[in-house]
Amino acid sequence: MRGLAKLFFLSCSFVSLVSSEKTDESPTAVSDNYMPKATATIDPSVFALSNDFEITDVPTTREYTFDIAKAFASPDGYEREVYVVNNMFPGPVIEANTGDTIIVHVNNHLDEGQSLHWHGLRQLGTAFMDGVPGITQCPIPPGGSFTYNFTVSHQSGTYWWHSHYSNSMADGIWGPLIVHSPNEPLQRGRDYDEDRIVFITDWMHDNSEIIIAALATPEGYKGNIAPPQGDAILINGRGQTNCTATGSSSCFYPPPPEIQVPVNCRVRLRFISATAHPMYRISIDNHPMEVVEADGTAVYGPTVHEISVAPGERYSAIINTNEGKEGDAFWLRTSVALSCMFGAVSQEGLAVVRYTGNGMVSTEEPQTSAWSDLAGVTVPCTGLDQTYTLSPRDSLSAPREPLQSHFFNSERGAFVNVLGNTFQGYGFNNISYQNQIFNPLLSIVQRGGSCENTLVSSRTFPDFGPGNIIINNLDTVIDHPYHLHGNEFQVIGRGTGALSIDNLTNIDFTLDNPVRKDTLWIQGGSWAVLRITADNPGVWALHCHIGWHLTEGKLAVIVVQPSAIGHMESPESWTNLCANTDPNAFGPAKRSSSPSIQSSKTSSFQYLREVKGKVVKRRGAREA
């Protein structure tokens, strides 16, 4: 490695902040040239949150314009085409307060549909803004635009946004979303002095479409039917690949990202896992980390040397920068959790944590060593909430009796599509998700229809009140991170094997202030019981957050208060996204332009031929 260039914390000039005036929200053409024109901007310094941001309980409107396009970038030293927002890689940081309204005008300059999901935000009363094509909206077409408009209600903490169209998230469409509140249990100035984001992703040298297409064949991707672990690990948009393995003469070794922190301070590190596959274990040489947040919930947690973060999860930890003097540097290490992924190989991503003060910033690389007690290959693959007790600082006990309990049996197996072809894929309750991308389930329920069909596993919570979601991970050797949209859940029980309605009453559940999350790692051959409050009408996705598994059908939905959905009024711009499309087409289908210009010519038969029956219904029935 080379000496590190001096990095300065610059403001993000690529986010377009505009006045809160009414705009035309109908989808319109913005571009018909989909080839990359620019080199993406990679600036890790934008992940240092400024203490000048005003934390207040006075609501305001924060308005952005996001231009999604292609660009060239070499985030790990290997140049490839990437997807960018406002030419930034990763995309812009959104920072707001509880009660603020966030408006994001999205212009899609790609040659495929797109959507944005606001991971962890409940979308209370704004189910139409959740951003899942085929579930809560039609995709934003190539050359089209759409405006997301929602209020952040009763939430604060660490979140993120990302594409929910196929697995194009893995090509670069993601960024942090931080919500502050003067009433949150963790207060800047009292509990910590400085605030930094650590945005972690796996990174592939091939576009996601290439990988998805290969995984749908018997040969798999590069001879392996299992999804890849990544060619590199990126931290705040930068990493280092093995240039020898790439065979590229232009590959180079960029300096690792640098996280500058004042000496003798308490620094909050917000770890966001935007990975498409691996669980990562994170440590900082010489610095114990006090866990203080899990998925937006402030917690009392342990002080540890290493934190495990699964895809979609977020954890905050506080470190004390009193292990040296101004200019000293320490390695932040991010390693693949080898016991959590079949066939994984050792891989480490590095960042520099450097102490700053009033003098010049040193460029010397760290000479520090890793903790001697870091997890090895044989360490069980458990989530942080399994390994330690994480107690929410705002105490909330779970109701003793649920109104309803629904089972979701999750497994890989043989499925058959409508053409009669068999393939190996993923599903819930014997159904592998088949996405009618231009006929959103939310719209179907709004019109009085039902999601109970052979295209998606669906369960309904008709009334307001507590309910159980029981996930049985029947894949004995495959672990999965499960993410639930529109809801925060309490983890009231875990165990090995599988639960059924017969033995559910025999479990001693944790009801006294259990941890609250929205993404949960469940080991193969294990179960978890999630307690929700069915208070947010909508059709909400429940899916594996390994992006490659999601594209192979690992998605189900819960329908909350369908009668209330029938009285919800959808925005006109939302309805216009589905104009001139084929509701029987299966996604991710493409349109050549905005629906105001040209109607979709994609038929379900054409699409099924294209993907060779990748998403199908499973043979047989095996309901809980």
Swiss-Prot record:
Changing H164Y: In mel2; impairs melanin production and decreases virulence. It catalyses: 4 hydroquinone + O2 = 4 benzosemiquinone + 2 H2O. Cu cation 4 binds at H480, C544, H549. GO terms for molecular function: copper ion binding; hydroquinone:oxygen oxidoreductase activity. Binds 4 Cu cations per monomer. Laccase that catalyzes the oxidation of certain aromatic compounds, including L-dopa, to quinones, which then polymerize to melanin. Able to oxidize a wide variety of aromatic diphenol and diamino groups in the ortho, meta, and para positions but not monophenolic groups such as in phenol, tyramine, or tyrosine. Plays an important role in virulence. Plays a role in dissemination to extrapulmonary sites but is not involved in pulmonary growth or in elicitation of cellular immune responses in the lung. This is Laccase-1. It comes from Cryptococcus neoformans var. neoformans serotype D (strain B-3501A) (Filobasidiella neoformans).
